[in-house]
From Swiss-Prot:
Record-stated family: Belongs to the enoyl-CoA hydratase/isomerase family.
Entry protein name: Probable enoyl-CoA hydratase echA12
Job of this protein: Could possibly oxidize fatty acids using specific components.
Organism: Mycobacterium bovis (strain ATCC BAA-935 / AF2122/97)
Gene: echA12
Enzyme Commission designation: 4.2.1.17
Keywords associated with the record: Fatty acid metabolism, Lipid metabolism, Lyase
Amino acid sequence: MPHRCAAQVVAGYRSTVSLVLVEHPRPEIAQITLNRPERMNSMAFDVMVPLKEALAQVSYDNSVRVVVLTGAGRGFSSGADHKSAGVVPHVENLTRPTYALRSMELLDDVILMLRRLHQPVIAAVNGPAIGGGLCLALAADIRVASSSAYFRAAGINNGLTASELGLSYLLPRAIGSSRAFEIMLTGRDVSAEEAERIGLVSRQVPDEQLLDACYAIAARMAGFSRPGIELTKRTLWSGLDAASLEAHMQAEGLGQLFVRLLTANFEEAVAARAEQRAPVFTDDT
């Protein structure tokens, strides 16, 4: 499946050996591609460090309204790379336990950056999402899978725990506790068809339609108010952590008032409907 599709590679975002690519396939859309297909885009530190850098730069690129995250070749991400883990930066003279902590923190940062990104993130899951790759997909706001994709909580198969990189937090919230327990404790594969049925992904599409389906979702979101989209993403995530309904409604209400009182977006929406045209939100008064 072609992932470059005449998109422009932004030189400023490219790592030295292009293990992470950032392209602009459509206006206001950035596509971040894990580009190590010979290792099924495994989460080696040589890939995760430039991914973290790319996310940081895209976050402050105000021309980007939506991010699409995908993998090159036939896989989304196979998770940990047991043969070529890469190099963790800034670990000189550290003992093995501290080195391990720095390694874990780096991977944790990537997951949290996806959540904190100003822009919505769509995971275009183009193939296997295994172990940490499943975690990476779950950290996105929206997931769309190709028909050939599948998902596996692989830690349990490797004699470890299946709980890593927020998986035991994110998966039950996505699909419910019983299904999450079963998938994580058995380490079985979840097909794209099943993933769609249980809500792990929003939809599955034929392989060749994956990116276009994601671009269509992204383009729709990009047409809405910037603070409206950003605050909706923020409250959706904070809702997963909310201690009470009352506290969360307060946060929602403040966000709604912020956009309603400080912009003319609502008036524009009403006028656009009356005039039977698409609204143009300026996010200003």
